[in-house]
Curated annotation (Swiss-Prot):
InterPro entries: 6-PGluconate_DH-like_C_sf, 6PGD_dom2, KARI, KARI_C, KARI_N, NAD(P)-bd_dom_sf. The keyword Ligase does not apply. This is Ketol-acid reductoisomerase (NADP(+)). GO terms for biological process: isoleucine biosynthetic process; L-valine biosynthetic process. The gene is ilvC.
Length: 491
């Protein structure tokens, strides 16, 4: 099979990369109605599979789970989760032929096997759903022409999809219809109903394309969302310990620092995050972020180039075929780092202390968010998509580090995200080594001293922060998420 994106001509590639429209709330007036009375069969009962299914059932849909015979016979975790939550569970052969919508929520590397198993069983005119388009775009999976192919991609881990729904809200969501598979022209109606059934319409839905979702998702998770947090954690911890900081305190400052810092980012963008600093610290964080952007821009651009060309995907799929040798090696190496094995700090760190003593971490967040956004937009991805795949998801990933350090982050994210994270972090750590030797007192682990600032310089820095395009689009999109709950509780 050929990479689907690479079969398109340049005009088609640009059109699909640039497809992004914020949908009006009244477009979801029918809610999940289009799927009421129809049979939805979910394949896979992981975090997305279970939690989307619970939401869909609570929205009045008929939901069941198709699992492999071995998973049922051996009563594996997927079978237990589905049955314990009262869902009908059956084999592919038992459930797929009756399904009006088959939703494939298995891991990326399983998609080809799953789709090849379910396609022959699907009835004529049924629909196939994804929450990530890797199988269609990068693998180039060919789907029967009578089947409608749609995507509903919540911009959140599965657990958050459920929690926000239970609060009467939802999470921002991308929806799309595969242009090669919409024989009856009902793809958008199916996608809208599915998105509404998960609660996504209450937080904002972007009509996108499979191509735009995949390319932006890969870029975000590899760079700012996971790769930058991993590289930053390792670099900052080692620097603190090298300068004599208690390893336990250093570990806590970093583990919970990302979460606390990005909570401000979530509520008010880069502007609010920077406003939590004293004026001298803000000027220093800005200067550090500009240095970081200059150093890291080529690395961000390389990742975007490799994602657009398909180089990243082909390399990762080669590792799949080699029993994940690279992935598992990198995972093991991460588990052996000093940060992951540092003792726990039993004392308290106040919320403001995370900001005052984490100026470099704030600079890393600012630089990473802006670079990811700028690089995606330069590649033809629309600003709204770039925002969701950079700034919006960052607090959610930071929250996983707060739970169990980098181990938890890499467990929660997909194998695709984890592989890309290691690629980026393994390049970023040596790239930033020299930069780390030039830090000043007050950049990390100690507060910036003094209060004196130049008014004109502060004015110009404030203007530069607030006039960045990600701040403009972020203010608009956050207006649809006024019900967001507070994730972080400073440790």
């Amino acid at each position: 099979m050929a990479n689907y994106f690479n079969t398109l001509n340049l005009r088609q590639q640009l059109a699909q990369l640039g497809k992004c429209r914020f949908m009006a709330r009244d477009e979801f007036a029918d809610g999940a109605g289009y799927l009421k009375g129809k049979k939805v069969v979910i394949v896979g009962c992981g975090a997305q599979g279970l939690n989307q299914g619970l939401n869909m059932r609570d929205s009045g849909l008929d939901v069941s789970y198709a699992l492999r015979k071995e998973a049922i016979a051996e009563k594996r975790a997927s079978w237990r989760k589905a049955t314990e939550n009262g869902f009908q569970v059956g084999t592919y052969e038992e459930l797929i032929p009756q399904a009006d919508l088959v939703v494939n929520l298995t891991p990326d590397k399983q998609h080809s096997d799953v789709v090849r198993a379910v396609q022959p069983l699907m009835k004529d005119g049924a629909a196939l759903g994804y929450s990530h388009g890797f199988n269609i775009v990068e693998v180039g999976e060919q789907i029967r022409k009578d089947i409608t192919v749609v995507m509903v991609a919540p911009k959140c881990p599965g657990t958050e999809v459920r929690e926000e729904y239970k609060r009467g809200f939802g999470v921002p969501t991308l929806i799309a219809v595969h242009p090669e598979n919409d024989p009856k022209g009902e793809g958008m109606a199916i996608a809208k109903a599915w998105a509404a059934a998960t609660g996504g319409h209450r937080a904002g839905v972007l009509e996108s394309s499979f191509v735009a979702e995949v390319k932006s998702d890969l870029m975000g998770e590899q760079t700012i969302l996971c790769g930058m947090l991993q590289a930053g954690s390792l670099l900052c911890f080692d620097k603190l310990v090298e300068e004599g900081t208690d390893p336990a305190y250093a570990e806590k400052l970093i583990q919970f620092g990302w979460e606390t810092i990005t909570e401000a980012l979530k509520q008010g963008g880069i502007t609010l995050m920077m406003d939590r600093l004293s004026n001298p610290a803000k000027l220093r964080a800005y200067a550090l972020s500009e240095q970081l952007k200059t150093i890291m821009a080529p690395l961000f651009q390389k990742h975007m180039d490799d994602i657009i060309s398909g180089e990243f995907s082909s390399g990762m799929m080669a590792d799949w075929a080699n029993d994940d040798k690279k992935l598992l090696t990198w995972r093991e190496e991460t588990g052996k780092t000093a940060f992951e094995n540092a003792p726990q700090y039993e004392g308290k760190i106040s919320e403001q202390e995370y900001f005052d003593k984490g100026v470099l971490m704030i600079a890393m967040v600012k630089a990473g968010v802006e670079l990811a956004f700028e690089t995606m937009v330069a590649a033809g991805i629309i600003e709204e998509s770039a925002y969701y795949e950079s700034l919006h998801e960052l607090p959610l990933i930071a929250n996983t580090i707060a739970r169990k350090r980098l181990y938890e982050m890499n467990v929660v994210i997909s194998d695709t995200a984890e592989y890309g994270n290691y690629l980026f972090a393994n390049a970023a750590v040596p790239l930033l080594k020299e930069f780390m030797t030039k830090l000043q007192p007050g950049d990390l682990g100690k507060a910036v001293e003094g209060t004196a600032v130049d008014n004109a310089q502060l004015r110009d820095v404030n203007d530069a922060i607030r006039s960045h395009e990600i701040e403009k689009v972020g203010q608009k999109l956050r207006g649809y998420m006024t019900d967001m709950k507070r994730i972080a509780v400073a440790g």
